[in-house]
Amino acid sequence: MRPLQERIINELKVKPEINAEEEIRRSVDFLKDYLKKHPFLKALVLGISGGQDSTLAGKLSQMAISELREETGDDAYQFIAVRLPYGDQADEQDAMDAIEFMQADKTVRVNIKQAADAMVQSIEENGLEISDFNKGNIKARERMIAQYGIAGAVSGAVVGTDHAAEAITGFYTKYGDGGADITPLWRLDKRQGRAMLELLNAPEHLYKKVPTADLEEDRPALPDEVALGVTYNDIDDYLEGKEVADNVAEKIENWFLKTEHKRHMPINVYDTFWK
């Protein structure tokens, strides 16, 4: 095993193999324990895209909330699934299929187009140019603003979808989809999350769907694997301690090192990771 590979695996807490049933229970109990420790919190809030990660995180969240209501008799507990399209979303049906699968207590829809466009316009009025890529990050941050607004209105915590295969590459927007209160998928790679959805009898098209952030207008629905230049299968193999081709390992490690700042709170004078 490569030295950096071992360090990454230890940092991200990835197991070479999992028992899907045990990991489902672990995530559900983790969410329940967090809410019980913070009795002022009565809701879990999560943006639903219709992809594998939000489908799994949403199902686990609803399971945790349902169990809490039954165990405590407190009907105030709720899970809120949030649709956050930018205008019209091409895969809207997938998102609705995911919400139906998780049987969300409540669905809220917030179209972020007006807010995102207004932000871009306001910045560009100052003589600055916002690239399409930069605008994509603005969209992601507007989505998180909406989720925290909803969570604030219902005494809730925002659930994140970050997992090991995403964390290793930093393939998320800093303070956008990378910002959340609690991340029940942390420690899992992509294939492990898929195994959990299979066990939960999720609709197959939701976890076999080609992963995409779909933030760029110049390159709509750009597959993650194209953007990264590496497949999730290779990333998962690397995270599980398996041997991958040197050029693949180098690309994964380059992403990890380049995006290290995303896995830290704002840098302070005592931080040394960046030196």
Swiss-Prot record:
One MF annotation (Gene Ontology) recorded for this entry: glutaminase activity
Gene3D superfamilies reported for this sequence: HUPs
Binding sites annotated in the UniProt record for Mg(2+): 53, 166
Cellular component terms (Gene Ontology): cytoplasm
InterPro entries hit by this protein: NAD/GMP_synthase, NAD_synthase, NH(3)-dep_NAD(+)_synth, Rossmann-like_a/b/a_fold
Reaction(s) catalysed (UniProt annotation): deamido-NAD(+) + NH4(+) + ATP = AMP + diphosphate + NAD(+) + H(+)
UniProt binding sites for deamido-NAD(+): 141, 174, 181, 261-262
Disulfide-linked positions: none
Binding site for ATP: 47-54, 161, 190, 212
Keyword Metal-binding appears in the UniProt entry: yes
Domain of life from the UniProt record: Bacteria
Documented EC number(s): 6.3.1.5
Alphabetical keyword list: ATP-binding, Ligase, Magnesium, Metal-binding, NAD, Nucleotide-binding
Annotated GO biological process: NAD biosynthetic process
Record NCBIfam families: nadE, PRK00768.1
Classification via HAMAP family: NadE_ammonia_dep
Reported function: Catalyzes the ATP-dependent amidation of deamido-NAD to form NAD. Uses ammonia as a nitrogen source.
Assembly notes: Homodimer.
Protein name stated in the entry: NH(3)-dependent NAD(+) synthetase
Gene name of this polypeptide: nadE
